Structures are given as structure tokens and as C-alpha cells.
Amino acid sequence: MAGGSQADSTVRDILATGGKVFMKAYWRFPLFILLSFSAACGGGSMSSSTPPPPVNAHVQIANTVTGPLNLAMSTSFQPAEWDYQFFTINSGATTTLGNLQPQHIRLQGISQGVPQGAAGSASTAWDFNILDAITQPVLSVGDHSPEFQIAKAPPFLYSGDNSGDDFVDTSFQPFATYAQNLVLYYNKGGFAANGQTYVSESPNPITWWGIYNEPNINNGLTPQQYVTMYNTLVPQMQTIDPSIKFAAMELAYFSGQPQAWLPAFVDVNTGVTARVDVMATHFYSTCNQMDDDAKVFAMIKNNFVPDIQYFYSEMATNPALAALPVWVTENNVNADFDAGNGMSACNPGQPFVLDQRGSDAFFAAWRPYVFSQFAQAGVQVLYHWDFDADAQFGEVDYNTDGLQLSYWVDYWLARMFPSASGANILQSSSDDPNIEILAALNPDGSVVIMLANHAVNAPNDNNGPGAPRNTAVDVSALGSFTSGSLLTIDTSTSVTSGPIATSVTPSASMTVSLNGYGVAFLTLK
């Protein structure tokens, strides 16, 4: 779900958020998906119950390594007519973005962010202005190596010149020609069309390319048609630039979707034959703001992790895919959005309610919990959806570049657990299942221990305060340390300046207190 990028193919969504207008492209929203969410949605309401006295918990960190920690953080943009002015109206936004240290920032151009054609028209004219208003600044930031997802084809390649309808030509040859021109534009000095030469301003090429967005819910595609699309586009793009790399699948998250789509793709006889560098998918904990906190947290272990494990088990059946990593290229708490007239896109007949859990103290427990579980499951990049948005989706505010608490959570995850550091995950245990632990041993002998408190205060809390925990952390097995620091992100953290680390004195057992939802990073040297 690209920021709530599903709606009936006859609906054009307009979501106005403080001056930013989201005009969603035409997307299919099959009935079975509606039913899946309906069956999963609960009836929690907004609540703010009073926390009880803290519960004492005990955590033990062993000196046993369980595997490498190689999970990078990243973020996303959706170049389109409702999004393209972000860098223009916020002159310092590239600095804010770069400070996150994102890896392979994701670009998902849709609607007028697709640089050829126009909705409802057979036009084949090119216009990169909206796409490049986001893409060019992103190419100047960080690793200068975004993942460009070819999310949609030009409108004239679909029935009725409508990008929400079926492809006219399911050989996908015309789509491949369009994709070749994108590679020419960004990597090989441009191309000529309609008496004009089109060439990217940036000296930085685009190495990473994603082949389509959420094929399991868009344009009536079948699993085998996606295989055909992938096998057609990738080799033809490689004829333009043999050095480029590819992300496959990028499925919308619903129960049973990996099981429905992966077998056809990985099949050694009838599946993918083109180059694949990563497999990718998307995860949201809910599509209904009424789902209570406990249900939203439970999705992580009960649904996200088993699906990642299924990805790896299916990939293992194909020698060409067996050693590849999985990237989670979209992730956030709630995928719902305003489908027009203030109504929910995911829950017909129900008013849309902005879910603040995407940017408050709930997120400070939820995202670290996700990060820890994905790190241990072998995910290699975790993408936030999306960078510039509102309080439900954004790390910063679209109109002001103002920071949200979600920004600081992702900022510190990237710094505490840098993916290229060579760190290893240490075995840990706890007597409290509501404390998520991730302990990392760095090559220099220092240790970072993350404790995320996702204890729910009351069973029906919806964006509640969480329940306080005093956690005794036993590090006696790790030897002695000479210095330490503690950094906490919770409801008391300044959104403007972020959390401030305090010095602590190392000892065999150290107590970390969290007064509700939040995360603490204990660093020992």
C-alpha cells in the first residue's frame, strides 16, 4: 500500500492535509482485500488510560552471537502532482533527509509523476518536471543511489488510457520500451523524442530499479503475468545499462498474499529467468484506525515475521534466488487514507480517522519492535512510508519540513545499528514478552542494547500511553565496561531537538525505566 494507494478503479482519491493535496491514482481494490481487512479489524476507540505503577522486568544478555546485524534504514517519496513541491517550499529539506542516513531512498512516481502520457489521453508526450522535482534532490543526498520503482506504465498502455485498468498488451513489450527510456534518461545521456532531447541533470545514475508496485492489487494482474512482465522489462533495461540492479515483487501486504504470488515467481521451470538482486514486500499493521494497540503490535510477530520467513523459504527453492536478501520497501502503522468526503478507503461506510500512532510515542515502541524482529529474520533494508507527509505517515511535515517523533526514532535506529558496521546480534532473554530486546556487539567491543516497551496499559487502548516498565538488564556475561550512555525516546521527547543521551555508570546489572510506550538505547564501551 503506497501510503494508502488502493481504491476502487473508478474512484479518484483526494486527501487534503494542511495544504498538501494527495490525488491518488486509479488503483484496484478487490473485494477479497476489503473482506480480509474487515475480518481482521477490531473495535478499539481512542483512549488514554492512566498507567499503573511500573512492572519490574528482567533481561539477560549472553555473550553468544546469533547472527549478523545487517539491517539498514531508509525512507520513501511518491513524486506526483500532490507531492512534487516539497523540496521547493522547504529549502533545507535535503539536509533533514540526509541526516537520516537513508540507504537507497525509494522513489515511487505515480499519476503525473509518470513522465510520459496523460490520464484519459492517448498522448505519448514526455514531461519529467514533476518526477524530477523530487528525484533530482534525492539523487544529491546520502548514498546518491535511490531505488527507482517503476510503479506504473504510461496511461496510454492501459485500457481506456486509464492507469487503473488492465494493460492493453500483456506481452509488456511497450512497457519495456518505456522502461528503457527511463534508463537512458537517468543513466546514459538521455534520449530523443518528439523533436526534443530528454536527459537527467544529475551526474549520478540510478542503479536500483523496482519492477512495478504491488502487482497483487493493481491492474488485474495475475502472478504469471507479473512473471512475464518482469522477464520482459529487466533484460531490455539491461541492454541499455548492464550494471543496473533490480528489486522484484514489492507486494501489498494482506494475509496469504506471499503464498499466492511467490510460487509462480520462484518456480525453476516457469518462473523468473531475468536478473533479480533483491526480493521486496510491504508491511502495515492495520488499515483501520479502530484497531486497538494490542492488535496492531501483535501483527509484527504473528504476521510480518512469518511472511518474511516464507519469502526466504520460497527463495531457497530456486538456486538463482537462494542467496538474495529481502527488503521491506514500505512500512508503517496504518495504510488507510481518505477516499474522498472524509470516508475510509479500507473500510467502506466508515469515516476516515487520521492515525496518530504513526508519529507519536506508540511509534517509538512499534518501529523499534519491527526493526528488531526484521533484523533477526534477515531483512536487509527497512523503508519508512513515507518521508514527507502528515502525522499518520510522515517523518516530517510536508508543508514545513517540521520533524515528527517518527523522524527521531528512525534517525537513532540508523545510528545505533549502522548496517555496514560488522555488528553481530547477541543472544538475549526476558521474563517480560512486552519488552523487545535487540543487543548488538560491535567490532570494537562496544555493545548497544535496545529495549522497546510495547506493553499495553489497558486491553482496549487505542493510542494509549502504554504501561511503565523498570527493566533490570544483566550484562555480567559480557565482561566489564568503562563508560556508558542511555538514550530514550518516548512521549516526553522533544520533537524539535530530539532525545539527549545521558551518561550512566556500567555495572553487572543496570536498570532502564520506560514510563510507557517508547524505546531506550543502552550503549556500553
Name each region found by the language model.
Residues P53-T96, Q103, Q108:
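Boundary/entry segment of secreted carbohydrate-active catalytic domains
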Residues V475-S494:
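Solvent-exposed beta-hairpin/edge-strand motifs
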Residues G98-F297:
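Substrate-binding cleft and catalytic face of glycoside hydrolase catalytic domains
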Residues F29-A57:
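Bacterial Sec-dependent N-terminal signal peptides
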Residues N332-E436, P443:
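Aromatic/acidic polysaccharide-binding cleft in carbohydrate-active enzymes
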Residues C287-G342:
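Glycoside hydrolase catalytic-domain groove-lining segments
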Residues S430-S480, Y517-T523:
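Carbohydrate-binding surface patches
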Residues S503-K525:
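C-terminal beta-strand-rich structural cap/linker in extracellular carbohydrate-active enzymes
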